[in-house]
Each structure stands twice: as structure tokens, then as C-alpha cells.
Amino acid sequence: MARPFRFGVNLMSAAPADEWRAKCRRAEELGYDVILAPDHLGMPAPFPALVAAAEATERPRLGTFVLNAGFWNPALLAREVATTDALTDGRLELGLGTGYVQAEHETAGLPWGSPGERVDHLRRTVEELERLLESEDHQPQPVQQRVPLLIGANGDRMLRLTAEHADIAAFTGARTRDGGSLEPLAAEELDERVALYRKLAAGRAEPAELNLLVQIVIVTDDPGAAIQPWLPRIPHLTEQQVLELPIVLVGTLDDIVERVRAQRDRFGFSYLTVLEPNMEVFAPVIARLREA
């Protein structure tokens, strides 16, 4: 039996307190299950933003999507996680990744390191967080017995780490290029990544939830025309190839609903995250899927 859908929205733009809370309430009204905050310079600090979101809402879970592990000391992060889980009444979901924007580390005066070094640091962070948050001696204590852990992954070592530790396996649907740019994965490439993850996770007692970050959502009767402004950003792919990317949902409402169902069947993606600019346009998709 397929896992039920969950839907998250990543709120990226800063706003005064009243506007931020109103935006969070709107996400709840639209049916989103998770309100998420990123971890990039120039965007709101994730933990206070999530506490404010909790004060403004009742139902949604609240998560980081995803923390840049290179910004965080594990002991200090454990304190933030436990405090935020307490202040949100146990609604926190912790998302972690290696980070992919070198310029942010340079601006913050933090070491960047090689890809392997960043994965090593993330592994140490995950293991130390688990040790601290599972200890009865750690103060403060989180409300949840285990704060659900999401790890954003694509490379082999990251998928192994995700298989070993994460409650939610988040697929970006893209590979990182030098300089911090992202190159989308075709469906066949994503098949291979998901298959490797499943192989690595074969011994798990409980299967993880699989997440996909959807980058583009456009409801339209003319997908070819609608996708034109995006093509210069993905010059190595044809129009049809872009429209077939798993992270792109462009078409009529019926088309998108069926595409979401088909991708759950094919890849196992039951938890979809959209970006803030797509919050309103994706809401009818949520409503239609909930009707079924």
C-alpha cells in the first residue's frame, strides 16, 4: 500500500512578524502539512522563524529544509533543536545537508572543505546530535522521543548516510556543480539514485519516507509556452526534456495530479516540497489529491 501524501512549503522570504505569521496561517489554510525554513544567508534564521510559525498555526509540522551543517557546531545545534522542539510542542522535523554554496561559507568566515570533508562533517554532526538528544542527561530535552531527521542527498556517500540515519530521505532531483549551481536529474538518473538508496537501506527496520523538492509548478493548458522562460536556465536540455524532469510539474491540474501519483508509484515520493513562490498554485493539487 502506498504511503499517504504529505506536502511541505519552504518559506524563503523575510517578512515582518505579522506578515510572517499570516503567511504561515495561509500555508495551513491551503492544506500544507509541513512549514519549512531554509538555512541560507540573506534568508530568515530558521529556528526563530519556526517558533513564530508554531505560534501562528495549530496543525502543520515545522522543519528545517535543510540546515547547512557547516554553519553549525553539533553541541550548539542540539540545544537549538531541543529548545525549538519544546517551544513548538513537539512539531519539529530536523532537515540537514552538507551545504552547496561556497560563497556563504566565505562570507561567514567558515571553512568550506572538499565534498568529502563536508560529508564527513555532516556524518559527525548527525552522530553527535543523536548521541546528545538521546541522552537523559542532555538539557534541554526535546518533547519528542526522537525528532524526525531528514537528510538531503544525491551522491553515493550521502545516500549511505541517509540510509543509516534518516527518517526522511530527501532527494533534490539535481546534482551540484562547481560554484553551487544545480543540474537537474532526468527521470532515469533519479531512478538510479533511488534504487541505490533502497539497496543501502534494505536492512532498515522501518522504511523511510521519501521526499522530492519540486522546483517548478505551473498550471496551464500550454506547457510548451509556459516553460519557455525557464529554458535559458537549463540550456543543456530540450523543451520536452525539461517538461519531463521529475522536479518540474507543468500542465493542466489533472495532468499534474496524475504526474504526482505516477511519481509516487515510480519513485516512492510521498512527501513533496514546493518553494514559496509556488505555494498558492500548488494548493489545488493538494486539494484534488486529498479528495481521492
Identify the residue ranges that each predicted region occupies.
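Active-site-adjacent structural elements that line small-molecule/cofactor binding pockets in enzymes
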Residues: M1-A292
